[in-house]
Amino acid sequence: MDFMKVFDQTVREIKREVNLKVLKVPEMEQKVLDATDNEPWGPHGTALAEIAQATKKFSECQMVMSVLWTRLSETGKDWRYVYKALAVIDYLISNGSERAVDEIIEHTYQISSLTSFEYVEPNGKDVGINVRKKAENIVALLNNKEKISEIRDKAVANRNKYVGLSSTGITYKSGSSASFGGSFQSGSSNFDSYKDRDSREDKNDYESFQKSRRGVKTEEQSYTSKKSFSRYGSTDHDNLSSGKKSPDSAKHRSYVSAAPSNNDDDFDDFDPRGTSSNKPSTGSANQVDLFGGDLIGDFLDSGPTETSSTNNNENFQEADLFADAAFVSASAQGAEFGSQTQKQVDLFSASEPSVTVSSAPPTVDLFASSESVVSPEAKISIPESMATPNIVDPFAAVPMDNFDGSDPFGAFTSHSASVSTGPQAPSVHGSATNTTSPLSFADSKPQHLQKKDPFQVKSGIWADSLSRGLIDLNITAPKKASLADVGVVGDLSNEDGNKASAASYYSGWSMGAGSGLGKTGLYSTQQQQQQQQQQQAPDISDDFFSSLSNQRYQSGGFKQ
């Protein structure tokens, strides 16, 4: 049974859509058909109000009434069509147009015929009684004209009490009247009167608001003029009486002049006095008053600003000098440390005239001493190639009588290129040990070198050949391999130290230092003489500093 109800409802919906889309049934007619359908519930109140509103139009009124008369002709099982049509007619008598009421009265005979409507359902229930009762009530109402007027007046009163919007967006109001048309017209007139009254009230409110706003503006203008007058009056009074301004009074005047500008921003009217009073507020408290008599006080007031600007310039210049402070401090330390080393040279070598270099080299290595010390026990003298004037330590004392007046760039000038460029930038800390090295230079080494040199190079070709290693004069090479070749330096005796020094000398040549060949005999004699002098020297500090210098050059040889 439920399936049949669902099926019937679906069929009705399809039929309705076909009527609207295919058959082009008018919308109002379709609304009347929906209000008088075969559903087990009555028509909706909104649909009834729309139908009653449509009866006020002639064309739609005829359309609505034709559908209702068609529904009243139904019989039998379609009793719901008849019953719902009678419900719509009852609503139109109270709320419909006069035209609709007149047409309903004309069809009183058709409605009275429904008082004998009969239909009994299969279950034995008499459902025709609903139609009969409804038809009897409508016929009784139609026969009483006064009753119709009373019902219509009551409906109008209800509409005035409850105002709503229809589907077309029109507000419905009505007043009490004898006829429906009169009530509708009176309702519209009442609506117009309400509208006029509201518009007048709004206009009065707007005018009162404008008046109050103009009053506020007038008060604001008077306040602004009073403020500006008091400001100018106070200025004239200060110029005439005291002649000396204080910063507090100047700040007070600036605040007073700035106050009207903040108040004028809240309003839109133009005030020329307000704008003129805004201009002095842009200046500072230290501005010079051109109309005042005391200009000296103004200049005194403006003094701190000038000093602050000069201080800013001085700070800027100090910042520029501070950018180079790192370089200046380094050179000052080098010079100061060089002066200290010069005093040490005077203490240890006072018998010999020396020339010291006071200026520091541009490249100073402050951490080179930690790498140069190898071992304090290995006492190795300085090779001749390292003692050439090309690598003079800038902090060391150089003897004036070097090489006995001979040419310092003599026979072994070609070997000066054998020394690597590593020690040419000596460390500042290591220069203290180099100051004692001229003791071994000036005593024995230069004289014995010139006396015992068996071979003098007279030709530049021979010197170039010797420097390049094209001619090998080293016939007596050492036959024993030393541990220094491998890089092992330990606790060596005096004889082992000689071998280690020779090995370090040749290791420097093998690594590309280019120290030259054929110097083994010369180097050994030089080493023996230096060892004898060191043994004969009674001064302990001399032996200590010479050993430190030898250690430094030994480490330089290993680095090469």
UniProtKB/Swiss-Prot annotation:
Residues 221-233, 274-287, 414-439, 544-554 have a biased composition (Polar residues). Interacts with clathrin, VTI11, GAMMA-ADR and VSR1. Binds to the deubiquitinating enzyme AMSH3. It holds the Pfam family ENTH. It is found in: Golgi apparatus; Prevacuolar compartment; Cytoplasm; Cytoplasmic vesicle, Clathrin-coated vesicle. GO terms for cellular component: actin filament; clathrin-coated vesicle; endosome; Golgi apparatus; thylakoid; trans-Golgi network. A motif (ALPHA-ADR binding) lies at residues 320-322. InterPro entries: ENTH (IPR013809), ENTH_VHS (IPR008942). One of its GO terms (biological process) is protein localization to plasma membrane. Residues 526-536 have a biased composition (Low complexity). GO terms for molecular function: clathrin binding; protease binding. May have a role in transport via clathrin-coated vesicles from the trans-Golgi network to endosomes. Stimulates clathrin assembly. Does not seem to bind to phospholipids. Plays an important role in the vacuolar trafficking of soluble cargo proteins at the trans-Golgi network. Residues 190-288, 414-453, 517-560 are annotated as: Disordered. The keyword Transport applies. Belongs to the epsin family. Disruption phenotype: Defect in vacuolar trafficking. Residues 193-220, 234-251 have a biased composition (Basic and acidic residues). Keywords: Cytoplasm, Cytoplasmic vesicle, Cytoskeleton, Golgi apparatus, Protein transport, Transport. It comes from the Eukaryota. Residues 20-152 form the ENTH domain. This is Clathrin interactor EPSIN 1. A motif (Clathrin binding) lies at residues 296-300. PANTHER family: CLATHRIN INTERACTOR 1, EPSIN/ENT-RELATED. Mostly expressed in cotyledons and flowers, and, to a lower extent, in roots, leaves and siliques (at protein level). The keyword Amino-acid biosynthesis does not apply.
